[in-house]
């Protein structure tokens, strides 16, 4: 059986989740609003609940790790939000990596969402096989 990974994209209005195999094939996906109550609920609380609900019907022990793309300036070495994107109150300083590792007992990698988009294109998308690429992303 191939290794399975959980991909989590934390955006300005929604968290998107995908169960992905080691070849990059999406097996299952879901989405949940992060702005449903005007950001009164801390974003990471919403993300954690969404992950819990998403992996419940799947074989969680088979997960090899969690990859998170997040809006804002991300300190990828520590997995912490270093700067805001503007619309998330209380986002700076949030320890995404540590929180999710403690909650789910899996290794977690966190990076900026625009960087992740381009890495995905290089790995399995339109930029596959190219050594020099540029990506432009527009978001909420």
Label every model-predicted segment.
Residues 21, 32, 58, 125-133:
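Bacterial carbohydrate/catabolite-sensing allosteric modules
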Residues 71-74, 139-140:
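Short glycine-rich anion-binding loops that position phosphate/pyrophosphate groups of nucleotides
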Residues 13, 114-115, 140:
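A generic "binding-loop/recognition-motif" signal
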Residues 15, 69-70:
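Short loop/turn microsegments at loop-to-beta-strand junctions
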Residues 2-45, 49, 81-83:
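Short glycine-rich, Thr/Ser-proximal phosphate-binding strand/loop in the N-terminal lobe
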Residues 47-57:
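Alpha-helical scaffold within the catalytic cores of cyclic-nucleotide enzymes
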């Amino acid at each position: 059986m191939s290794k399975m990974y959980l991909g989590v994209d934390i955006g300005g209005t929604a968290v998107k989740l995908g169960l992905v195999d080691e070849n990059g094939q999406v097996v299952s996906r879901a989405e949940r609003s992060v702005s449903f109550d005007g950001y009164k609920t801390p974003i990471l609380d919403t993300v954690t609940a969404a992950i819990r609900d998403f992996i419940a019907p799947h074989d969680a022990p088979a997960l090899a790790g969690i990859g998170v793309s997040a809006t804002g300036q991300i300190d990828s070495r520590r997995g912490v939000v270093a700067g805001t994107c503007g619309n998330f109150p209380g986002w700076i300083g949030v320890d995404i990596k540590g929180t999710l590792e403690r909650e789910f007992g899996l290794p977690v990698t966190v990076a900026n969402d625009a960087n992740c988009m381009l890495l995905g294109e290089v790995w399995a998308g339109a930029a596959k096989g190219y050594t020099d690429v540029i990506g432009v992303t527009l978001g909420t």
